[in-house]
């Protein structure tokens, strides 16, 4: 049980996919202008990442390995992720049309979010079992959501701040992301396995 909790903590905080592995930067920079949008995107990505990790494990274990078709892994994972994202998009559209409009193009773009595919491929490469795969996906999603919400809150404050003209826009956003990455480096050494 402790091993699973440490897996979630290390994936979310220490080996954060956005700040350490630099995966998922497109939605990180694109959807992080408002906290409400970031929370919605975080919830959608959490669902997709967790289910994609489970699905990737099942497809790898019960389809690709028995058929000796591991060379199709990336293509099959992309197709599985696309199906999961379409399901998520339909659920969000039916449950919250306001959130659906706020997320706009970024909801279907979860399909091409490299963090989703990266987590699925890393799960296979790390030889995680079923529970570890799901928790790894959930931890990665929790870390992504945490960083996305924190970054969007910082960006909302930057709008009201007196930022020099040369640093306005993407420049100050990248500097802020770099400072967040430095802050998350403080978690290094938190989990000893």
Swiss-Prot record:
Tell where it localizes.
Cell inner membrane
Biological processes, Gene Ontology terms: electron transport chain
Mind telling me which GO cellular component terms the entry cites?
plasma membrane
Tell me the Pfam families matching this sequence: Rnf-Nqr (PF02508)
Q: E.C. number, please? A: 7.-.-.-
* Keywords (A to Z) from UniProt: Cell inner membrane, Cell membrane, Electron transport, Membrane, Translocase, Transmembrane, Transmembrane helix, Transport
Cell inner membrane as a keyword of this entry, yes or no, is yes
Provide the transmembrane region boundaries. 5-25, 39-59, 65-85, 102-122, 134-154, 171-191
Q: Does the keyword Transmembrane apply?
A: yes
Q: How does it sit in the membrane?
A: Multi-pass membrane protein
Question: What broad class describes the main subcellular location of this protein?
Answer: membrane
Top-level EC class = translocase
Q: How does it assemble?
A: The complex is composed of six subunits: RnfA, RnfB, RnfC, RnfD, RnfE and RnfG.
What HAMAP family does its record include?
RsxA_RnfA
Q: Tell me which family the UniProt entry assigns to this protein.
A: Belongs to the NqrDE/RnfAE family.
Functional description taken from the UniProt entry: Part of a membrane-bound complex that couples electron transfer with translocation of ions across the membrane.
What name is this protein filed under? Ion-translocating oxidoreductase complex subunit A
Organism lineage = Bacteria, Pseudomonadati, Pseudomonadota, Gammaproteobacteria, Pasteurellales
Gene behind the chain: rnfA
């Amino acid at each position: 049980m402790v091993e699973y909790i440490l897996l979630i903590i290390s994936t979310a905080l220490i080996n954060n996919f956005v700040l350490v592995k630099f995966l998922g930067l497109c939605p990180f920079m694109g959807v992080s202008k408002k906290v409400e949008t970031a929370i919605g995107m975080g919830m959608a990505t959490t669902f997709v990442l967790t289910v994609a990790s489970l699905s990737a494990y099942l497809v790898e274990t019960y389809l690709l390995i028995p058929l000796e078709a591991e060379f199709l892994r990336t293509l099959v994972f992309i197709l599985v992720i696309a199906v999961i994202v379409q399901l998520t998009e339909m659920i969000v559209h039916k449950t919250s049309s306001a959130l659906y409009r706020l997320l706009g193009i970024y909801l279907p773009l979860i399909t091409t979010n490299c963090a989703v595919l990266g987590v699925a491929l890393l799960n296979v490469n790390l030889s995680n079992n079923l529970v570890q795969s799901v928790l790894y996906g959930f931890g990665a999603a929790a870390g992504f959501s945490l960083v996305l919400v924190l970054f969007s809150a910082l960006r909302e404050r930057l709008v009201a701040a007196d930022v020099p003209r040369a640093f306005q826009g993407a420049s100050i956003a990248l500097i802020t992301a770099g400072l967040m990455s430095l802050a998350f480096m403080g978690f290094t050494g938190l989990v000893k396995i």
